[in-house]
Regions:
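Catalytic beta/alpha-barrel core
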Residues: 94-99, 154-160, 179-187, 199-213, ...
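Conserved, mostly hydrophobic/aromatic
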Residues: 73, 150, 184, 252, ...
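Alpha-helix-loop-beta-strand connector modules within alpha/beta enzyme cores
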Residues: 91, 161-193, 216-225, 270-284, ...
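Active-site mouth loops of central-metabolism enzymes
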Residues: 120-141, 228-232, 289-298
Length: 490
């Protein structure tokens, strides 16, 4: 079963939310404030901690009557097991909710948007730079990496003045592996070699080497046309006339210049080419900016892809050489979907896909002190819960409520916990460090959950350290696994 918000989901009419006793007040408050466009009910099962549920246990303990009218059941996001087990028993769609109930409003907003999200019409060409200087193994590894990152075409970048006798074999190997291949060179012999081996795109031709394109007639190979060196857009005309006469498909690249070397003027050239040639295919080398701008590449790629989407530039060339551009191909893949959605839906590129928000968070979800005090009143076990907000860290259990705004000194917080078990101390130290980082960067913290780094976010811990520690501390497995017992997760 697809999680709520997945592409192709159906808008529900009535939703049944399943939760535990501790989370019930917060869940009801979130739903009340959300005022969702569907009817809903909340079912509180016989368990304190919702995160300790499994789908098998829910299937045994949940009671859904046909008269309830629910067409969607939302179970806790941290619940383990296959939701299909519940769906098969009750004949209703069952999906996991967000791991943090505070994300429910945004979660359902995304579900609606996701039904229209994911399409793209910008092709990504990923360049392997200085290919002649790399081993065959390194070239294949780079190509595999770029393809897995979302590249549509693998560009073999030749080096001017350096012989590349293996070019044909490299192109053939990549094509045999199911990849589409282009070659980046002005050298006519290298162009002929690569095309003979199966390359489908040539970067680039201008007045200096356009005659080689005559040899490509009938192959279906596309060429990228750039202005003559030092020339204006007017120098494109002669090359375009020849390519049209020879029936060679082409893309126009007016050349994106780095900041400090005419960046703004180069953007204007792209707009001018679109005005002069409204039907022409175009390419933009966005790597010229990401590689030469000391800034995280996520935002740079987002803006450049947005420009391409609005101008109808249907191909981009990028690479990942400098460290701050690592992940640029994946970023372009996310950006082309986001910007396609924004432009075609005539909306802002927000609220549907936050994977390009990496260092900061789209929203910082917190609890107030009153909410945490109310939560503490319902806790009966000594296991510590850790919370973070914009100003500090709170740690609480059934007896202690510790609050600190000095997040750079988590040792002071730890000293007040009275923990002497090494494993428990390690666990709490890890969580406090993560909470401190969240406060420092302005991110949402969720105990035992990975901080959000956008498309770079690692998976959450697969096994709850806190549950495991609870089991050991109490000397019995029942404490953490018997749903009738109080647990350790809120």
């Amino acid at each position: 079963m697809k999680d709520a918000g997945s592409e192709g989901g159906v808008a529900p009419r009535r939703v049944l939310f399943v939760t535990g006793r501790l989370a019930e007040p917060a869940l009801r408050r979130v739903l009340s404030e959300m005022a969702p466009p569907f009817a809903y009910d909340v079912t509180v099962l016989r368990i304190t901690v919702a995160a300790l549920m499994t789908t098998e246990w829910i299937a045994r303990n949940l009671d859904i009557q046909p008269t309830d009218g629910a067409d969607l059941v939302i179970i806790p996001g941290l619940c383990e097991g296959d939701p299909q087990i519940i769906g098969d028993k009750f004949g209703v769609r069952v999906e996991r909710g967000p791991k943090d109930l505070r994300e429910i409003p945004n979660h359902f907003g995304r579900a609606a948007a996701a039904r229209e999200y994911g399409a793209w019409d910008i092709e990504i060409v990923a360049e392997i730079n200085n290919a002649p200087r790399q081993t065959r193994e390194a070239l294949r590894g780079a190509a595999d990496y770029f393809r897995a990152s979302g590249a549509d075409v693998i560009d073999v970048g030749c080096t001017p003045g350096l012989s590349f006798p293996a070019l044909g074999d490299v192109v053939r190997e990549l094509i045999a592996a199911g990849m589409r291949v282009s070659v980046d060179t002005f050298d006519p012999d290298e162009i002929r070699t690569a095309v003979a081996a199966g390359a489908e795109l040539v970067l680039s031709v201008n007045g200096s080497n356009v005659e080689v394109a005559r040899d490509l007639a009938g192959t279906g190979t596309r060429v990228v046309v750039v202005p003559d060196l030092g020339g204006t857009l007017d120098t494109l005309e002669a090359s375009l006339e020849k390519l049209t006469r020879w029936d060679i498909p082409y893309l126009i690249d007016p050349i994106l210049e780095p900041i400090g070397y005419g960046f703004m003027a180069s953007l204007e050239r792209y707009a001018e080419v679109r005005r002069r040639y409204p039907e022409a295919e175009m390419l933009m080398g966005i790597g010229n900016l990401t590689e030469l701008t000391a800034a995280d590449s996520t935002g740079v790629n987002a803006l450049l892809i947005a420009v391409c989407q609005e101008l109808g530039v249907r191909a981009v060339l990028t690479t990942e050489v400098i460290p701050w551009a690592r992940g640029a191909v994946r970023e372009a893949d996310v950006a082309r979907r986001l910007m396609h959605y924004a432009v075609t839906q005539r909306t802002s590129p927000k609220g549907v896909d936050d994977r390009l928000v990496t260092v900061k968070d789209p929203a910082v979800l917190t609890f107030t002190e009153d909410e945490l005090r109310a939560l503490q009143a319902g806790i009966t076990d000594p296991n510590f819960r850790v919370f973070a907000d914009r100003e500090g860290i709170t740690v609480l259990n059934n007896e202690r409520f510790i609050r600190s705004t000095d997040v750079t000194n988590i040792g002071d917080i730890f000293a007040q916990l009275g923990v002497d078990d090494a494993a428990h101390a390690f666990y709490l130290g890890k969580e406090l460090a993560r909470a401190s980082l969240a406060v420092t960067l302005g991110k949402t913290y969720r105990q035992e959950g990975a901080l959000s780094w956008g498309y770079l976010t690692p998976p959450d811990d697969l096994k709850s350290d806190r549950v495991r520690l609870t089991q050991r501390a109490e000397g019995t497995r029942r404490r953490a696994t018997d749903p009738s017992a109080d647990g350790s997760n809120a």
